[in-house]
């Protein structure tokens, strides 16, 4: 994307509309309002807190995890994990508070809607019908309404309505609507709102009422591109019939607000605000890296909605800011170990803009350094990494002179996901350096939306400050790896060991043992929740840990009996009873760290290792280890047009004796090279399938087919796959296929010609074996010749 062109266009647009529109990459923009990729937002205010429920985007196709963002001021948002949904897809969540005092959470999978219930807007949730994935609204529950995107509306009399639908553009189709019974488990009335009333209805219905008018708003077009937009119709009844009124939200002139839609509305006093998603800048392939924005709604005297003026400014704070200190990092001089390109330069980490990102060039250890100009007192640093729903490991150091460095926060063993990551200390320094050292997933690197440095203590984000399991004991310390404060309980006296008891791993403090955790922000007088699980009298039970807390420390002590403990938690906010009860029954999730110990060459096969006419039941892998074994018929080595080659006739299938290296999981960089000749190329022929999984974006499959969409490399992703339109012309000729992926861009070359280049994202899962000659499902037999095959777990650009 040409950013200069976009900035100029933004300025021209501002002049044309009569106000100074900020460029999308200016410092301090209010849109996007959240640092990360999220879509399909529902915004609610419960009490004095704003809640943002949204599809977790940037992870394929809304694969979760479940989360909610909370804010007291509508500017500073904190990501909070939720226990449910736990399904494969978690799309388009909506939450409402019922007159019965409970909160109801609606979400969808294709094509069904589920409903959960909780005593708090944060959960814990459980499916209202019992089983976790029990369905409230099955597909076509209302004839010709494809079930998706459920959204509630509560009328003045307390009646609750649910609206849903997708692909409502077909003749006779539209949006499903129903009035829920008082038990929230059934409907007393349903209706199809046809697309003759809601013109071009595609999906994402949202209903609100103002001055006696019911507004039925919805999204039209494709969520993948610029055609996505919001339109509306009105009625004097919640179920209609409705009258179409027009379009109120669409892509702006310069394309920096691209594909806006799937919205909700927040009413604050007499003001109305529309929260919607738009595509990221620069626009990612497929359109599944969406970001949340908000702009003001205005109404004409007749009640019609004026087309929204979309901005990069947003609306600002709706309450007093919870942050009291100045952000010292804003506009600071900055340098970094690397940056991907001009769209992701280091300055974007210190611009207080949730739509711009510093992305390092590599996926290994990378650093970014800020110069504050003069030495300043620093007590808090917020880091907003690219993906708040996965954990990052990092080190923050400070320096007065840029030469001698001291540790401010050591999170190199962190396993807690969150946004912002909040680190506290007290130091006077001019320079601050963040070093990314690893994390939960391969191939995502240490990209950062914002780094914020504060002179004061900024502890407003509601988070889990301490989280410890038995696995966090290293023989000397009990490390706080699942807690935001980091650090560790130190062994003051006695001894401790890990033991499995009552179905759980526990830390056993022998009699007379004392562990102590110190941090100046710990206090019994401040709002908090502290808890743990202990094993007593033959069962696990809640640990009354309040007595362990004093000003600045927590002390665990076993007197005459061992203390058997795990799941020790401390929150800097007060949990409700239901949340405490859930913690008392639920283990802290301790996810593994991604394997980043690269092997280099993982797979290496060559027909040059054999003699012509050899029959080959086994192929030794000259990469990391192992071999490939024929399932039935073995290959025969032939001489074809100057090269030795393994001859596949559609019946030979080989599987590896080894798993795919863990270094190739998730979105890891890779390079794939092969020499292939195929006399008669079919639509889809699989040369090698490196993965055994078969879900979206989980494939690395080398294909030799004429299918222009996926005839060269297949990832099980409609947008991510790549083919070659002129593949038929290569029949009977040697093809040198070279594919390289750096974690963002994938290039595909055939005989030195670049045939595909695009940004993609992969979600490769653990794979039990590699398959040659067909895919892992046993389909797409290969009928051709393979001279050599190589796979590296690193990015190796093709040399000229």
Predicted features, each with a name:
Residues 21-199, 209-255, 270-271, 277-321, ...:
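Beta-rich carbohydrate-recognition and catalytic domains
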Residues 297, 381, 396, 451-453, ...:
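Extracellular beta-strand elements of beta-rich domains used
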Residues 351-462, 570-572:
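Aromatic, loop-rich ligand-recognition surfaces of beta-strand-rich domains
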Residues 464-465, 472-504, 510-551, 562-565, ...:
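Extracellular glycan-recognition modules
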Residues 514-520, 711-736:
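Short, aromatic/His-centered strand-loop micro-motif at the edge of beta-sheets
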């Amino acid at each position: 994307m040409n950013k200069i062109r976009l900035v100029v266009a933004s300025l021209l647009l501002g002049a044309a509309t009569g106000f100074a529109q900020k460029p999308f990459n200016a410092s301090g923009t209010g849109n996007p309002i959240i640092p990360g990729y999220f879509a399909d937002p529902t915004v609610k205010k419960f009490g004095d807190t704003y809640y943002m429920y949204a599809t977790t985007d940037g992870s394929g196709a809304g694969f979760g995890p479940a989360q909610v963002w909370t804010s007291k001021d509508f500017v500073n948002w904190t990501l909070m994990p939720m226990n449910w949904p736990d399904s494969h897809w978690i799309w388009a969540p909506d939450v409402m508070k019922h007159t019965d005092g409970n909160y109801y959470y609606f979400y969808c999978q294709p094509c069904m809607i589920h409903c959960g219930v909780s005593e708090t807007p944060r959960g814990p949730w459980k499916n209202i019908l019992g089983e976790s994935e029990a369905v409230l609204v099955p597909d076509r529950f209302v004839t010709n309404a494809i079930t998706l995107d459920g959204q509630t509306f509560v009328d003045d009399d307390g009646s609750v309505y649910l609206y849903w639908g997708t692909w409502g553009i077909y003749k006779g189709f539209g949006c499903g609507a129903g009035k829920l019974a008082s038990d929230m488990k059934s409907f007393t009335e349903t209706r199809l709102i046809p697309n003759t009333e809601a013109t071009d209805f595609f999906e994402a219905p949202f209903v609100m009422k103002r001055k006696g008018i019911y507004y039925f708003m919805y999204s039209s077009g494709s969520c993948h591109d610029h055609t996505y937009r919001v339109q509306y119709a009105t009625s004097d009844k919640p179920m209609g019939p409705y009258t179409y009124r027009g379009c109120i939200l669409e892509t702006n002139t310069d394309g920096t607000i691209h594909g806006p839609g799937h919205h909700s509305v927040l009413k604050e006093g007499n003001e109305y605000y529309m929260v919607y998603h738009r595509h990221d800048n620069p626009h990612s392939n497929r359109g599944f890296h969406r970001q949340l924005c908000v702009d003001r709604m205005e109404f004409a005297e007749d009640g019609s909605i004026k087309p929204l003026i979309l901005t990069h400014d947003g609306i600002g704070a709706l309450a007093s800011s919870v942050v009291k200190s100045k952000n010292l990092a804003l506009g600071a001089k900055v340098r970094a170990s690397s940056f991907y390109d001009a769209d992701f330069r280091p300055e974007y980490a210190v611009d207080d803009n949730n739509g711009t990102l510093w992305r390092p060039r590599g996926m290994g250890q990378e650093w970014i350094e800020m110069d504050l100009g003069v030495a300043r007192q620093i007590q808090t640093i917020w880091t907003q990494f690219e993906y708040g729903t996965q954990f990052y490991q990092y080190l923050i150091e400070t320096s007065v002179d840029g030469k001698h460095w001291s540790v401010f926060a050591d999170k190199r063993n962190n396993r807690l996901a969150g946004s912002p990551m909040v680190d506290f200390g007290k130091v006077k320094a001019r320079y601050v350096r963040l070093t990314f050292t690893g994390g939960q997933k391969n191939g995502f690197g240490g990209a950062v939306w914002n780094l914020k440095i504060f002179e004061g203590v900024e502890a407003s984000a509601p988070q889990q400050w301490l989280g410890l399991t038995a696995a966090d004991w290293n023989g000397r310390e009990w490390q706080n790896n699942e807690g935001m404060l980091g650090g560790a309980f130190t062994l003051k006296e006695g001894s401790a060991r890990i033991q499995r008891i009552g179905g759980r791993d526990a830390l056993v403090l022998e009699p007379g043992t004392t562990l102590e955790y110190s941090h100046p922000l710990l206090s019994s007088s401040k709002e908090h929740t502290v808890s743990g699980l202990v094993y007593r009298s033959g069962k696990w039970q809640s640990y009354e840990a309040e007595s362990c807390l004093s000003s600045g420390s927590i002390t665990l002590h076993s007197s005459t009996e061992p203390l058997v403990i795990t799941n020790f938690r401390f929150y800097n906010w007060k949990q409700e009873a239901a949340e405490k009860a859930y913690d008392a029954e639920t283990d802290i999730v301790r996810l593994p760290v991604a394997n980043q110990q690269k092997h280099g060459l993982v797979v290496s096969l060559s027909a040059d290792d054999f003699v012509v006419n050899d029959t080959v039941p086994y192929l030794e892998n000259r990469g990391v280890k192992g071999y490939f074994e024929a399932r039935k018929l073995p290959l025969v080595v032939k001489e074809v047009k100057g090269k030795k080659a393994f001859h596949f006739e559609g019946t030979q299938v080989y599987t590896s004796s080894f798993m795919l290296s863990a270094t190739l999981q998730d979105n890891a960089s890779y390079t794939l090279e092969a020499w292939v000749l195929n006399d008669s190329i079919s639509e889809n022929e699989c040369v090698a399938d490196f993965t055994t999984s078969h879900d979206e974006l989980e494939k690395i499959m080398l294909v030799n087919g004429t299918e222009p969409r996926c005839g060269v490399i297949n990832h099980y992703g409609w947008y991510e796959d790549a083919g070659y339109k002129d593949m038929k012309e290569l029949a009977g000729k040697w093809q040198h296929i070279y594919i390289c992926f750096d974690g963002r861009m994938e290039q595909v070359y055939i005989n030195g010609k670049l045939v595909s280049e695009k940004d993609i994202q992969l979600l490769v899962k653990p794979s039990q074996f590699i398959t040659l000659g067909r895919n892992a499902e046993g389909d797409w037999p290969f009928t051709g010749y393979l001279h050599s095959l190589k796979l590296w777990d690193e990015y190796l650009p093709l040399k000229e």
